[in-house]
Curated annotation (Swiss-Prot):
Region called Terpene cyclase, residue ranges: 1-323
Biological process, per Gene Ontology: alcohol biosynthetic process; mycotoxin biosynthetic process; terpenoid biosynthetic process
SUPFAM superfamilies, per the entry: Terpenoid synthases
Protein name: Astellifadiene synthase
Catalytic activity field: isopentenyl diphosphate + (2E,6E)-farnesyl diphosphate = (2E,6E,10E)-geranylgeranyl diphosphate + diphosphate; isopentenyl diphosphate + (2E,6E,10E)-geranylgeranyl diphosphate = (2E,6E,10E,14E)-geranylfarnesyl diphosphate + diphosphate; (2E,6E,10E,14E)-geranylfarnesyl diphosphate = astellifadiene + diphosphate
Binding site for isopentenyl diphosphate: 436, 439, 468, 485
Domain of life, source organism: Eukaryota
Residues the entry annotates as binding dimethylallyl diphosphate: 484, 562-563, 598, 605, 615, 625
Binding site for Mg(2+) 4: 475, 479
Necessary cofactors: Mg(2+)
Subunit organization: Hexamer.
Keywords: Isoprene biosynthesis, Lyase, Magnesium, Metal-binding, Multifunctional enzyme, Repeat, Transferase
Residues annotated to bind Mg(2+) 2: 92
Length: 716
């Protein structure tokens, strides 16, 4: 293969854990093209489909997914291929968390069928058709023949995998046969051949796919290894007792532990590496394979190694992985403005192509790109010459294509429209951070009993999510937290003023949704629990700011207000709008759930390695919070001068050093404070189980989904 667009990477610069030994790694010379189109995809999704937040797909700090897995992508194709891959990631995540994934797949399938059969994609209420149309139109404008091949491959991939989301696999062999297709063998074939301008002769296609199987087995297994935690969490969220992942299948079939299953997965990946290297070496000696087939087979080697390097450091799978500074700047300030061409449009289908294969949709979108000097507004350098050449080459004779802007518009007094994009940016950021979505899961589980109609249930979920994320934004400001879920806290990116303003605006959004429930009692519940939440937070802040240690009773009263309030809010709203014949007061369960959750959080803050990655080491001590273990310690050692002076120093410096934290933890062990907290958690959990059992008996319905959530909270 002749390398024109990529650079060989020094093995000292990346980690493979021995999962692709013998295969070099290359990286595209212009990864900014991928970054722009991935972030553009996020913007389009928000405008046409719904909230997305700071989405974690193909981008990463050091190695972006497409730039390292298709390093020889033609520069004028890298962007749209990255956009298509990012769209597939987002859609895949929707499938993972949706109760009816087949419906989501059907909508995608119909869109591609319309484009291929009729040359146009009709509008759909899902909004995803607009993005499909955008992908198709850009690809067709570049290379109609290969674009159609790529889109057909994508369609075939959806048709082959979309009906098996509920399937359970009996053995590893059966699973891997399915997984090779599920990981996107046909989808990747379409992207790779389009990106590198490869055409596989029809008579070699079957042979080509057969030879490629070890490579796709390698990529499928690697995906299962790095995505295990993410996929397991999705299964729990949906109340499933199985997971479509090699690690789960290996555990089930062989009765082995999770660690043993992971090691088995690693060994299978290494075996697939050896198998494909052998297949490729043998293929090089064949005279019946065309140049393009060999180019495709060789390119798969770099897809394998690139997938390993990207997968092992991707924010998509690892919450402690980061974006690059350039990516963070673009996320915060928006994409750079494109080279200011006369018509200010991007890659559209040539006019002569419109009759046969033009993906038409009657809405449009303003594009973004570079400023006058090839720099973004925040000063980030971008390869202007390359982008300009790519743009000019594919803008000749192109017609305007846009997608509609669904941003909420507000009329100013002078009649001009104001939008909420800037106002919502901090909120969108925090909603995009990794989350277990416990409250949404709990709402779905509680609905086994309450049977709230879908439309009202969605409103209750939205109200809960909005208030929860707004409270996190304000909590981090008030506590001075620098990390949230392993990422920079919202105010460290957007500043205090913008974050507070955005968080306050969320109360307006939540209230608008309460009004849609169309009853005065819902408004009363909303104001009561919102009041409780603020009262609880005020008590917490007062004790911290004035170095006043509360009693145990005062602490639990604060938690009942602050954390229990949101749990009570959604259960009370569900009870109001329940269609169940059984009328039950759920407040005892929801209050106990809130208290248990906060106490558990206090404990994990001190002892959990995962929590350290998410929020920092012993963050509650750093913030001067009076958590349950600290309250017990102060009561157990009221005259300990070391402890008192550490707390006093915090009031002066507002900092607790690592050494000081370790001293406090040592005192907690010595005084039995951590043991006391564990025992308290056990007692609280017993009360939680009692309330749960009582509700099961009253409703006369077993709630396996809620029970699974409670077990997850206890054992996590």
């Amino acid at each position: 293969m002749e390398f024109k667009y990529s650079t060989l990477i020094d093995p000292e610069m990346y980690e493979t854990e021995g999962l692709c030994d013998g295969i070099p790694v290359r990286y595209h010379n212009n990864p900014e093209l991928e970054e722009i189109d991935c972030l553009r995809c996020h913007e389009h999704w928000r405008e046409n489909v719904g909230p997305l937040g700071v989405y974690k797909g193909g981008l990463a700090d050091q190695w972006n997914g497409i730039s390292i897995a298709i390093p020889e992508a033609l520069p004028d194709r890298l962007g749209v291929v990255s956009y298509a891959s990012e769209f597939a990631f987002v859609h895949d995540d929707v499938i993972d968390i949706a109760q009816h994934g087949n419906e989501q797949n059907d909508d995608l399938r119909v869109g591609f069928e319309q484009m291929i059969d009729a040359g146009a994609i009709k509008y759909s209420t899902s909004g995803k058709r607009a993005l499909q149309s955008y992908i198709a139109k850009r690809m067709l404008s570049i290379d109609r023949e290969r674009a159609i091949i790529s889109l057909r491959a994508w369609l075939e991939f959806i048709e082959k995998t979309g009906r098996q989301e509920e399937r359970r696999f009996n053995n590893e062999k059966e699973f891997l046969k399915y997984r090779i297709y599920d990981v996107g063998m046909l989808f990747w074939y379409g992207l790779l051949t389009f990106a590198q301008k490869i055409t596989i002769p029809e008579n070699e296609l079957t042979t080509c796919h057969e030879l490629a199987i070890p490579a796709y087995r390698h990529m499928a297994l690697l995906n299962d290894l790095v995505s295990w935690e993410k996929e397991r969490a999705s299964s729990i969220a949906l109340g499933k007792d199985y997971c479509i992942n090699f690690i789960f299948v290996a555990m089930e079939e062989s009765g082995i532990s999770e660690d043993e299953a992971k090691e088995r997965c690693r060994e299978e990946i290494k075996l697939a590496t050896v198998d494909y290297l052998r297949v490729f070496d043998e293929a090089k000696d064949r005279i019946d394979l065309s140049h393009d087939t060999m180019l495709y087979l060789e390119s798969l080697l770099y897809s394998m190694s690139g997938n390993v390097v990207w997968g092992l450091q991707s924010p998509r799978y690892y919450t402690d992985a980061k974006f690059s500074q350039r990516q963070l700047d673009w996320i915060k300030n928006g994409l750079p403005l494109e080279v200011r061409l006369e018509d200010r449009v991007f890659g559209l289908s040539p006019s002569e192509d419109r009759v046969t294969h033009q993906a038409v949709i009657e809405n449009g979108l303003p594009e973004s790109g570079l400023g006058k000097n090839g720099n973004s507004s925040n000063g980030v350098d971008v390869n202007k010459a390359l982008l300009s050449a790519v743009l000019h080459e594919h803008l000749k004779g192109h017609a305007v294509f846009k997608m509609s802007d669904h941003e909420v518009k507000v009329k100013a007094s002078n009649g001009r429209s104001l939008d909420t994009k800037v106002l919502q940016a901090p909120y969108e950021y925090i909603t995009g951070l990794p989350s277990k979505r416990l409250r949404e899961q709990a709402i779905d589980a509680m609905n086994v009993w309450f049977r709230v109609p879908a439309e009202k249930l969605d409103l209750i979920k939205s109200i809960t999510t909005i208030l929860h994320n707004a409270s996190l934004m304000l909590d981090d400001v008030e506590d001075g937290s620098e990390l949230r879920r392993g990422n920079p806290s919202t105010h460290t990116i957007f500043g205090l003023s913008q974050t507070i303003n955005s968080a306050n605006y969320q109360l307006v959004r939540a209230l608008e949704r309460v009004q849609k429930l169309e009853d005065s009692e819902s408004l009363l519940v909303f104001t009561e629990e919102l009041r409780n939440l603020y009262i609880g937070q005020s008590m917490d802040l007062y004790w911290t700011g004035n170095l006043i240690c509360p009693t145990m009773n005062e602490y639990f009263h604060m938690v009942e207000c602050k954390t229990g309030g949101l749990f009570r809010l959604f259960t009370r709203l569900m009870s109001l709008h329940s269609t169940s014949a059984v009328k039950v007061d759920p407040t005892t369960l929801s209050t106990r759930l809130g208290i248990y959750f906060q106490t558990r959080d206090d404990y994990k803050n001190l002892v959990s390695t995962e929590y350290t990655k998410q929020k920092g080491y012993c963050e509650d001590l750093e913030e001067g919070k009076f958590s349950l273990p600290l309250i017990h310690l102060i009561q157990a050692m009221p005259d300990n001068h070391v402890l008192r002076n550490i707390l006093t120093q915090w009031r002066v410096t507002r900092k607790v050093t690592l050494a000081q934290k370790q001293v406090v933890l040592g005192l907690m062990e010595k005084s039995g404070s951590l043991k006391f907290t564990r025992e308290t958690l056990a007692s609280l959990y017993s009360g939680l189980e009692k309330s749960f059992t009582e509700l099961e008996e009253k409703f006369g319905t077993e709630n396996f989904q809620l029970k699974l959530i409670l077990q997850f909270l206890r054992t996590e």
